[in-house]
UniProtKB/Swiss-Prot annotation:
GO terms for cellular component: extracellular exosome; nucleus; pre-snoRNP complex. Changing L455H: In a colorectal cancer sample; somatic mutation. SUPFAM superfamilies: HIT/MYND zinc finger-like (SSF144232). The gene is ZNHIT6. The lineage of its organism: Eukaryota, Metazoa, Chordata, Craniata, Vertebrata. Zn(2+) 2 binds at C232, C235, H248, C254. This is Box C/D snoRNA protein 1. There is a cross-link at K79, K108, K118, K138, K143, K153, K162, K173, K183, K200, K459 (Glycyl lysine isopeptide (Lys-Gly) (interchain with G-Cter in SUMO2)). It holds the Pfam family zf-HIT. The keyword Lipoprotein does not apply.
Length: 470
């Protein structure tokens, strides 16, 4: 833009110098040289065009001896160019003043100088033709430079918009800026984001009872390789599978039952703990109410009742022995005699050595067979699914099971067992035997190598030895 303005100033200055240096000599038949003021008088006071003054000069030239045929042709050309000059000047002034006058006031002064040159010039056709031709060249240069300047502004705006989009989207693109190429940094940003999103693995921490923690954020505390899926309600250890659950129960001797009376500090006491305590009190009240309604457990057992139990057992051929109060078996025993049905309801303990399981059956009538007693445990169809899973060694066995009962009042080093008939009733199997508090039945697999020696096997071995000696 500055270069265009300098060229324009030079061209305007040249016109002014040419106009000042030209001094037209008087021609024959004319009174003298008329300057621009005289042209205004001949033109009737019109400013800007001077068309009337030129016409009067042409009339004066008719008497001067010039060719009358050439002058009208030149006047028509001059008229058209002079008529077009104000419009061209207005367009140039409008564009220049709107875009560049505020920043560069010198251009406005040069336009004013051109107007003065136009007014001070003589009526010479050659000078006027040179003046009128000059502004057309200036107009084209100004238009071209103005267009270039607007394109530069649009390119700058586009670059600013691209940079804003680049920062907003957090994506760096390859762009040519000052002849240098900016490399893409997408991969670098992605690596940083991935590093930030990684979760650091922390060693397992034993949280107190009642503490909540998401299972997805912990590992199995038994194997330490898989993701935790279960949590033991008692010891709060995390496990991933059934083998890990069994392993942790065997190692820690945990029964998997939540301890409802475990200590919880005030800081860790939550609404869930309050609800658990409330339900525990409800269970205690329900148990107390159940005992109060039970006719047989309503009163404490007196010595008279103990003698009554022994006498009834003796009548059925059972030698029943009762322990003093305070012994564990005495507390556990729930055996009673039903006077209406005239039968015993026994407290029976069932032990499964091959599965290391132990169960208790209460109020078992003495007329019930042993097979009926074992059906809820080892029957493939009628047994409980949880118990069946634990006793699957007995269910899958094709050899069957043996029911044994320990012989009481034997020497300490001699442990022998009775083999019971599973098809007979409990009363028939207990006759002529000694029972301490309640019967304990050992269910073992046939043919398994164990240290349990049955009584009839001992008798057969003794008879063989006697025969060999004879």
């Amino acid at each position: 833009m500055e270069f265009a303005a300098e060229n324009e100033g030079k061209s305007g200055g040249g016109l002014h110098s040419v106009a000042e240096g030209v001094r037209l000599s008087p021609e024959p038949g004319r009174e003298g040289v008329r300057d621009l003021a005289g042209a205004e008088e001949f033109g009737g006071g019109e400013e800007g065009t001077g068309l009337t003054g030129i016409k009067e000069i042409g009339d004066g030239e008719e008497g001067s001896g010039q060719r009358p045929e050439e002058i009208p042709m030149d006047l028509t050309v001059v008229k058209q160019e002079i008529i077009d000059w104000p419009g061209t000047e207005g367009r140039l002034a409008g564009q220049w003043v709107e875009q560049e006058v505020e920043d560069r006031p010198e251009v406005k002064d040069e336009n004013a100088g051109v107007l003065e040159v136009k007014q001070e010039t003589d009526s010479s056709l050659v000078v006027k033709e040179a003046k009128v031709g000059e502004p057309e060249v200036k107009e084209e240069k100004v238009k071209e430079e103005v267009m270039d300047w607007s394109e530069v502004k649009e390119e700058k705006d586009n670059l600013e918009i691209k940079q804003e989009e680049k920062f907003v989207g957090q994506c760096i693109k390859e762009e040519l800026m000052h002849g240098e190429c900016v490399k893409e940094e997408k991969d670098f940003l992605k690596k940083e984001i991935v590093d930030d999103t990684k979760v650091k693995e922390e060693p397992p921490i034993n949280h107190p009872v009642g503490c909540k923690r998401k299972l997805a954020m912990s590992r199995c505390e038994t194997c330490g390789t898989e993701e935790a899926k279960y949590r033991c309600p008692r010891c709060m250890r995390y496990s991933c599978s059934l083998p890990c659950v069994k392993k942790h129960k065997a190692e820690l001797t945990c029964n998997g039952v939540r301890d409802k009376t475990a200590y919880i500090s005030i800081q860790q006491f939550t609404e869930m703990n309050l609800l658990s305590d409330y339900r525990f009190l409800e269970d205690v009240a329900r148990t107390a109410d159940h005992i109060s309604r039970d006719a047989f457990l309503k009163r404490p057992i007196s010595n008279k009742y103990m003698y009554f139990m022994k006498n009834r057992a003796r009548r059925q051929g059972i030698n029943l022995k009762l322990l003093p109060n305070g012994f564990t078996k005495r507390k556990e025993n729930s055996t009673f005699f039903d006077k209406k049905k005239q039968q015993f309801c026994w407290h029976v303990k069932l032990q499964f050595p091959q599965s290391q399981a132990e169960y208790i059956e209460k109020r078992v009538p003495d007329d019930k067979t042993i097979n009926e007693i074992l059906k809820p445990y080892i029957d493939p169809e009628k047994s409980d699914p949880v118990i069946r899973q634990r006793l699957k060694a007995y269910i899958r066995s094709q050899t069957g099971v043996q029911i044994l009962m320990k012989i009481e009042y034997m020497q300490q080093n001699l442990v022998r067992y009775y083999e019971l008939d599973p098809y007979k009733s409990l009363l028939d199997n207990l006759r002529n035997k000694v029972i301490i508090e309640y019967p304990t039945l050992h269910v073992v697999l046939k043919g398994s190598n164990n240290d349990m020696k049955v009584l009839h096997q001992v008798k057969s071995e003794s008879t063989k030895n006697v025969g060999n000696e004879n």
